[in-house]
């Protein structure tokens, strides 16, 4: 866990400082059943702990997906432009 707090985990998209740890980790522990509690209900009701922070995270994820789609479209457009090679005279250039 020290590596995650120091930011050495390059695979995580969202930094841990973005979250209020108490509001995020406790519902996750309740959901996964790792938190030792007397209630044996396994229902995972995270809607009660939703805050504006959670909603903004969902919006950011959707925006990232749209940006990725836009990037793939740009790459395809560039590929189409490159399909027409410039006509070469066949003279000069390479000497073997």
Swiss-Prot record:
Organism in which the protein naturally occurs: Arabidopsis thaliana (Mouse-ear cress)
Region (Disordered): 32-96
Biological process terms in GO annotation: cellular response to hypoxia; defense response; innate immune response
Keywords: Plant defense
Name of the featured protein: Elicitor peptide 3
Lineage of source species: Eukaryota, Viridiplantae, Streptophyta, Embryophyta, Tracheophyta
Transmembrane annotation, as ranges: none
Family, per entry: Belongs to the brassicaceae elicitor peptide family.
Protein task: Elicitor of plant defense.
Regions of compositional bias (Acidic residues) in chain numbering: 52-71
Pfam families documented for this protein: Pep1_7
Biased composition (Low complexity): 35-49
